[in-house]
Amino acid sequence: MMKYNWKNVLAVAAVSLLTAGLLAGCGGVKKVEKTDKPADAGAKKVVKVAHRADSVPYCFINKDNQSDGFEVAVLKELAAALPQYKFEFIPTSDDDLLIGVESGKYDIGVKGAWYTKARKDKFIFPKHYIAASVIGITFRKEDEGKIKDLESFAKLKGKLVPIAPQNAQYAVVQQYNREHPDNQVKLVPSENFKVDEAYGWILEGRYDGYFNIELNHINNVEKETGKYYKLRDKFAYVRHQAIPTYALFNKKDQQLADEYDKVWEKLQKSGKLLELENKYFGFDIFKLVKGDGKGER
């Protein structure tokens, strides 16, 4: 059962959406959050951190117009541990973040980014992931007693909404099928479609399950602003696992990436990471990560 801290999440949702609208309209933002005083600027290397402005609870702009979210909070801990740098947090769009980190406009980017071979060629992936994104199955409420995981879904011969091959979910189902050759889920590749369409297909009976990101399910079904909120009693959801997300570093910032890994290990050992997980997710999300998270995602 999902236990996100909705009091905090809903409080910032409206602000996050407004910020996202502004980003779409102007292609960027004017606000830059700095972690120390301008007087020190000349003596320190500036580290520019780009982040999405509307991805609650990972990275967003909060009600106080400050950069916030789990991934941002981890990088603010990094900033505190590396006083030789001056960190600037810059909310922006997906495209600007990816292009900017690759080109050197930004040093680091966080957006709930999964590991892919294509991205590995463009960015430095540190040893340690920064967060994780939960994926699971959305299905009809009437099947709640029958579907408890992918294995039980496969035994029912359920029809899964097609998945784009480049999506992480596709690779996860492929891995499940390799591990369960006698009880596979029929995996059909698809072209991209609007996420909210899949929920309608489930209710229509066209498909029996939608293997999707938990936040998509929450935003479409459980939030009052969701398209299917009024039909929420007709849906059920079970978690499968969490896919690691990474901070993306510019190719020239290997030293900074190495320092990130050292600080991450200290944060884990001290319990600070778990503290932040409970604050932003309401539970230990890393427990749902299987393996090291590497491989094609």
Protein language model regions, located:
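Ligand-binding clefts/hinges and TM-proximal coupling segments of bilobed small-molecule sensing domains
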Residues: 28-31, 43, 85-88, 164-188, ...
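Periplasmic-binding protein-like
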Residues: 53, 131-138, 224-261, 283-297
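Extended ligand-binding regions for polar small-molecule ligands
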Residues: 72-82, 141-144, 151, 159, ...
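A ligand-binding cleft/hinge motif common to bilobed small-molecule-binding domains
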Residues: 96, 112-122, 171-175, 203-241
